[in-house]
Structure formats: structure tokens, C-alpha cells
Design a protein with these regions (language model features):
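Catalytic-core regions of core metabolic enzymes
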Residues: 1-712
């Protein structure tokens, strides 16, 4: 990605002219409104674009009432935006001509660039260089264009775009996919969500998602941003913009595609993106308050609701229905989704007790029963009681429609309460589209009340709101870097790595390195039995896989165990250069944990903590944090482990020393954060002993930048 001359400021100014133009040129203009060269003209007219429109066509003197120019060089100087609706072969020349005429920015629809591989990337780089030298912002190539619904400026060939006029805070859509940028836009509009911008970034030869995000955040009409990306190309910029958005009260929602191996392969041929480390990306974005979702529906739902309300003040969700089965289903969904349906205040329960029929039970979720069909006001009274509860941050109302008359009465009763709520409310009328009269649907959407068509979808959306509410807490304390000097290319085996850990304040077992069986016997006798024998080599990363670990319970067994270990190692790794055998005290009891720290080329230093020790990869139970995570953030992340109950003392076992584990994670994070020559630190396993007894690093490896330990 390259920038126009003038650097970042020049790119930003050119993109601003492109996104909010007062004059537009269509290059390759056609009189066929269904063609790529005709659709932009038709859309500009249908939207009522208030600025100047210039047409360039080599085959037409006029299109409709507008005259056509023969070439870009005939354009008046300083047109803000040019749409290049021409074949790929003429695009480079057109960009150079646009630069000569002072055009602010160009939209390139043509494909056949970086998404095709090396040859295409070379052409894309030439295109980007021409734009940079000419000071022209460039959208695309291989994009569907941009639609500014605020200023009625559609620069796209997407025929179905409605001439929607955004007049209040809404959702800006920014996507690396043209088709999905429009799909998200149509879905949002169908839900009554105000869309302010729909931006397809394409191959991002010059401008990326982050650059457009910066611009839409300037607009007071932007209440939320829905982003769909295959690759975040400017990590530091998107994190900085997340902080800017938080200050402005704008919610950022992101769907990251290309997570699977096959999807990453497909993305190479789709937009030229190489998907980054998904877990690290999620950790970095989440901690800055960017809401990560897993589907297009979730993206539309969350962004639309957040644009309307912003994040709730509390993560608690109240669920109200007129069906006992729906109440039970909501409890199941809440458990599956990890949602908090809090207990209600006594005052709320008293109110509900007075409002509900005698055979209904006050609580959360609450089933008002079918009495709501006979007494529509019951819906509103119960909803009002729930919204007044201090533990409730958002409300889901899941109702059956009844007959057309009953459904209308339900809507009549609920709308004043729901539309006037300051807390997020989500209305779901169960049964899909069939039982909901269009008039009622329109009234709900016109009142600004989010309408989703299933309890599951509503609860998923509410869960996303709850997650953001938890993130609204004051920024947690972050760790201070600790610098360690390690030569580049060095790989420290276990004894030296444990010296590093000891200097950081981690506890390691007592032990020393032996060069032969006699020395091992002498060391073991001094330590006291039982002891552990471990082969030591920087090339030996997974000792247990190579049979390089032995356990000795009695002095008489030491020599035989020593020789047996060497024989196993000779069979498994005959070329291994051995430094010696580490003799250590045996530490038993507790829970084994993997603690690792690494550097991601995009996101920087990060931590991995997983239960299972050497079996962590098999169990797949691990969390990722950024390396500067403080104690509160680490503790919260650990509770997300499926096996966290083991640390709490499951099935009568003693609870683990969680503070000691948190301290160890924090100290390793400080080391990778402050030591630029360290590529990786791994403690595996870290044995978390019962509460008050600490945590012990049983094995360790430290790798310098450029170091390459072999697997074994």
C-alpha cells in the first residue's frame, strides 16, 4: 500500500474529496444504465447528487442531456472524484491523466491485479506508484466503489442501491468485499437502520479500511461502523482509531474473514490478503473495544443497535416473553452463549408480582403468559419494570404475534415504552416473517426499535452489547516492560532459560546440570529423592516426545535411569548434541499450565496461557493476551478457559494459587515486552500449586531473534 505525494495528510485529503465530492467525472461513460459505465450516471441522477457531473466518452457526444468530453485531459481542473469505468488496460494511463488535471481521487472498478498473483501485483504496484506520484487518492482496484448516503454521492455500479438519504446517526459500512459491502448495506436498510456510507475498499493498493475508517469517524452522522476485513494492513492505526472512536462514542464492529486454512488459501486469490494470526488479532482488537462478531447477521445487528443506543451501562440482560417454552429456550441459549441474565432487584420483583397473573412467576427471564393477548398493556408494564431495574443493561422482548388484531394491540402497547427507552431494547416477534403484518413491521422500524426475527439472534446481539459494557470499565493497569539482554540468534536450553525466569521472580525447582551418571548421582543425593532427570539441548524443544525425561524415586535406580534416558534419546534423536542431564527436585501436585510469549509481526508481543501443559495443543484450551496485560486483564482472560474450574478447585480438589499464576504471566509478559532481542519465551509446564504455595516453572525455553530451535 502506498500513499499519494504529501504523505498521510495528502492521502487523507484526497480520500476526503473522493468520499465527499462536490464534482464527479465518469470516465468510460455509457448511455446504458445497466452497464458499468452507465450505472454511476443513473445513480447520481437518481440520488439527486447536487454537484457537477462530467462525462468522458470516446464514442458518445451526449448522454441524455449531458455533453461528453473526449478525454480526461478535457476535464476542468480540480474535479474531486473520477469513476474509472474502463477496462484494465487503460486504467494506468487514466490515473496519470487524472493526476495532470488535479483530480482528488479515483475509483478503479477493474480487476486483474494483485488478486491474480505476482504478475498482477506488479501491475498493481505500478498503479499505486502512479497515484502516489500524481497525488491522487485511489480506491481499489477490484472494488465496487463508494456510496455516501449523507451527501447523496454514489460512486458505484451497484444498480440496486436505494437513494436513501441519511439524516441522523447511523452505520458506516466499510468492507474489503464489494458484494458483501452491498449485502450488509441492504440488510441494514431492511432492518430500518440508517446507513451513512457503504465503502468497498477492494485490493487497497493505496487506501485501506483504516484510512476510510478515519474519514467516517470525522462525520457526526456516524454512530457505528460495520467492518468486514480479510486482513488488517495497518494494525497500529486501527488500534489508535479505536481509541478515537471510543472518545467520540462511536462503536466499531468487525467481522474477520479468512480464519480457516481453506479460507486463507481462497483469500489469496480473492483480494490478495494474507490472513494474520487470528487469535492475536482478536486479542489486540478486543482489548481496544472493537467488537468482534462471527457472522454477517451479527455484524448488521450489533452495529445497528449500537448506532441507535451506544453500549449499555450494564452487561445484564433481561428477557421477557409470553411463552414458557421460549423462557426455557432463553435460559439454554444464555448458558450456551455465556450471557448474564441477572437476578432482579427486590423492588422489581415486587412490581412484577403485582403486574403478572397469579400463575406466573416473577424473575429473569419472565414469562407473562398468554394473558398478554387479552391485556396488551401487560407487555408495556412488564417491559417498563425490567428497564427500570439497575442490573439490567438491555432488554429482549420475544413475543408471539397472535391474530392480526392482537399483534397490532401488542405493538400499540409496547412501542411507547420501547421507543422511549434509553437502554437498548430488542423486539423479536417469533415465527419469522409470515405472521407479522407489514404495517406493524413498518411501525416498529419507523419508531427506531430494533426488530430481529428469532430469540437466538436477539440474545446474540444482546450478548455483544453486554461484552462492550464490560469493556467500558476504566482501563486496567498495564505491565511495565522489563529489559533482558539476549544476543540475537541464541537459543537457551532449560538451565539457562530457568536462570532468566529466576531473575524475573519466577520459582524454579532446585537442580543442577550433570555431565555423567556419577555426577547425576551426587547431585540427586544432595537434593533428596525423588528427582527428575532431563536431557538438555537447545535443539530439544519437546522432551517428553523424545523420551528425554526420567523419574527416579530411589538412589539405587539412578544409574539405570540415567543410562535408559540416554538410550531412548539415541534412538529418537541420534544426531542431537547433548549439553548434559539436568537433575532436579521433583515437584508434585497442582495443575499444569502452558505459559508462552511470542512476537507477532503485525501486532507485537503477546502471551498464550493454556491448561494441560504438554497437552495444551491437544486440548485446545488456551487464551491469548497482549504482553502488557495487567493483573485484572489476565485474571479475566483465565476465567475464559474451559478448564478454569480446575484452578478453582473442582470436585473437592484444593483451589490453585491463582495470584501466583497471574504474577507469573505478568512477569513473562514484561520480559517479552521490554526485550526486543527475545523472540519467544516458553514455560511448559508451569505447575500451579494449591493456594498459597505458588507456581513452579518445571521446564523452559528462551529463543532470541533469529534463533531456530528444532522440534524434538
Amino acid at each position: 500500500m502506498t500513499e499519494p505525494s504529501g504523505g498521510e495528510g495528502g492521502l487523507r485529503n484526497g480520500l476526503r474529496r473522493l468520499l465527499r465530492p462536490s464534482s464527479v467525472a465518469v470516465i468510460g461513460a455509457s448511455d446504458d444504465p445497466a452497464s458499468i459505465g452507465g450505472a454511476p450516471i443513473s445513480l447520481l441522477e437518481r440520488f439527486g447528487f447536487p454537484g457537477e457531473v462530467h462525462l468522458v466518452s470516446r464514442s458518445r457526444a451526449r448522454i441524455g442531456s449531458r455533453p461528453c468530453l473526449r478525454s480526461i485531459d478535457d476535464l476542468p481542473y480540480g474535479v474531486d472524484a473520477a469513476v474509472l469505468a474502463i477496462p484494465r488496460a487503460g486504467v494506468l494511463e487514466a490515473v496519470e491523466a487524472a493526476a495532470r488535471r488535479g483530480v482528488g481521487g479515483v475509483v478503479v472498478f477493474a480487476s486483474g491485479y494483485g488478486e491474480l498473483g505476482p504478475a498482477g501485483r506488479s501491475d498493481e504496484e505500478a498503479l499505486a506508484e502512479a497515484a502516489r506520484l500524481g497525488g491522487v487518492a485511489l480506491a481499489g482496484p477490484n472494488c465496487l466503489g463508494l456510496v455516501n448516503f449523507v451527501d447523496a454521492a454514489p460512486l458505484t455500479f451497484a444498480h440496486a442501491v436505494p437513494n436513501w438519504q441519511a439524516a441522523e446517526r447511523g452505520v458506516a459500512v466499510v468492507a474489503q468485499s464489494g458484494a458483501l459491502s452491498m449485502a450488509l448495506t441492504y440488510a441494514a436498510l431492511a432492518q430500518g437502520v440508517m446507513v451513512t456510507y457503504a465503502i468497498s475498499t477492494g485490493n487497497e493498493a493505496v487506501a485501506g479500511v483504516e484510512d476510510y475508517l478515519e474519514l467516517v469517524l470525522e462525520d457526526e452522522c456516524t454512530g457505528a461502523v460495520a467492518m468486514l476485513v480479510e486482513q488488517v494492513r495497518q494494525p497500529s492505526k486501527i488500534l489508535a482509531l479505536a481509541r478515537t472512536a471510543a472518545k467520540k462514542g462511536v462503536a466499531l464492529c468487525l467481522l474477520h474473514t479468512g480464519r480457516s486454512a481453506r479460507a486463507r488459501e481462497a483469500s489469496l486469490t480473492h483480494t490478495g490478503a494474507i490472513a494474520g494470526n487470528q487469535a492475536v488479532l482478536r486479542a489486540a482488537l478486543d482489548r481496544e473495544g472493537i467488537l468482534l462478531v462471527d457472522s454477517l447477521d451479527e455484524l448488521v445487528d450489533a452495529a445497528g443497535i449500537l448506532a441507535r443506543y451506544g453500549p449499555p451501562s450494564s452487561p445484564g440482560i433481561a428477557f421477557m416473553t409470553d411463552s414458557g417454552a421460549a423462557k426455557t429456550h432463553a435460559l439454554d441459549l444464555a448458558q450456551d452463549l455465556g450471557l448474564d441474565l441477572p437476578s432482579l432487584a427486590d423492588a422489581t420483583l415486587d412490581r412484577l408480582g403485582r403486574e403478572l397473573p397469579s400463575f406466573a412467576t416473577a424473575g429473569n427471564p419472565v414469562d407473562i403468559t398468554a394473558m398478554g393477548l387479552n391485556d396488551p398493556g401487560l407487555y408495556a408494564r412488564v417491559a417498563g419494570s425490567l428497564l427500570d431495574d439497575p442490573s439490567v443493561g438491555s432488554l429482549v422482548v420475544a413475543a408471539m404475534p397472535g391474530s392480526d388484531r392482537q399483534g397490532t394491540e401488542q405493538v400499540d402497547a409496547l412501542l411507547p415504552t420501547l421507543s422511549g427507552a434509553s437502554k437498548p431494547v430488542i423486539y423479536t416477534i417469533m415465527g419469522g416473517d409470515w405472521p407479522l403484518p407489514e404495517a406493524n413491521r413498518s411501525r416498529i422500524l419507523d419508531a427506531g426499535v430494533p426488530l430481529l426475527r428469532s430469540p437466538e439472534r436477539a440474545l446474540r446481539a444482546a450478548g455483544h452489547l453486554a461484552h462492550l459494557a464490560e469493556r467500558r470499565a476504566p482501563a486496567a493497569e498495564r505491565v511495565r516492560p522489563v529489559r533482558l539482554d539476549l544476543p540475537e540468534g541464541v537459543v537457551l536450553g532449560e538451565p539457562a532459560a530457568k536462570d532468566i525466569l529466576r531473575s524475573l521472580g519466577l520459582r524454579v525447582p532446585a537442580g543442577s546440570l550433570a555431565r555423567d551418571a556419577a555426577e547425576a548421582k551426587s547431585l540427586a543425593d544432595r537434593l533428596g529423592y525423588p528427582v527428575v532427570l532431563k536431557a538438555v539441548s537447545p535443539e530439544l524443544r519437546h522432551k517428553s516426545d523424545a523420551g528425554a525425561v526420567g523419574f527416579v524415586h530411589h538412589a539405587d535406580d539412578l544409574a539405570a535411569s540415567y543410562e535408559s534416558l540416554l538410550r531412548r534419546l539415541e534412538r529418537a534423536r541420534p544426531a542431537l548434541v547433548l549439553e548434559g542431564v539436568l537433575v532436579e527436585e521433583m515437584v508434585r501436585g497442582g495443575v499444569e499450565v502452558l505459559l508462552g510469549a511470542r512476537r507477532d509481526p503485525d501486532w507485537g508481543p503477546y502471551l498464550v496461557v493454556g491448561l494441560g501443559g504438554i497437552f495444551t495443543e491437544v486440548l485446545g484450551d488456551a487464551v491469548v493476551l497482549m504482553a502488557d496485560a495487567g493483573p485484572a486483564e489476565i485474571t479475566e482472560a483465565l476465567t475464559g478457559l474451559r478448564g478454569f474450574p480446575l484452578l478453582e478447585g473442582a470436585r473437592g480438589s484444593a483451589p490453585g494459587d491463582l495470584p501466583a499464576l497471574v504474577a507469573a504471566v505478568q512477569r513473562v509478559g514484561a520480559a517479552i515486552l521490554g526485550s526486543p532481542t527475545i523472540a519467544e519465551i516458553e514455560v511448559n509446564p508451569l505447575l500451579v500449586l494449591p493456594c498459597g504455595l505458588g507456581a513452579v516453572a518445571l521446564d523452559a525455553l528462551v529463543v532470541g531473534i533469529g534463533g531456530t530451535p528444532r522440534e524434538g
